[in-house]
Amino acid sequence: MCCLFGLMDCRGYFGAKKKAHILSLLASECEERGTDATGIAYCTNGHLNIYKRPAAAHELRFRIPGDSRVIMGHTRMATQGNAVRNRNNHPFTGNAAGGKFALAHNGILYNDRLLRCTNGLPRTKIETDSYIAVQLIEQKKVLDFSSLKYMAEQVEGTFAFTVLDEHENLWNL
């Protein structure tokens, strides 16, 4: 399975270097749950940024802007979808009213193909079970408690999700 990690600096106490150092430590500790890929999502100047690579966390150098207050991360052990294809790595990007969002998942979803068929969702080049969560939220056209609840009630399997939007709202399911 994978691992989720993150950092919230609501008061802006940490500088960019300190945030990068803390994230590097957190991500490296998460490697025991996955070394196939590592990714983070954060906001700066009202824009959502995603940095992900098919590499173990200790191989990456995180550069976080000083104004980023909320950062979510993911280390991956690939179960579906080749990690070398970066599109299969987390966090994923989605779109809803109000802007973009990032989603990362830990666990295994068993009904992703069934949900894609029954909900008329398009097939994508992303080869993971996790991406169905993005599609279900996008189907509702808004990122809020109701769409997250809908998504969580539809998927079957084991899961923990983190979702970050462009306004630095963070949801943990």
Language-model features: locations:
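Conserved short alpha-helical segments that host acidic/polar catalytic motifs at enzyme active sites
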Residues: 1-173
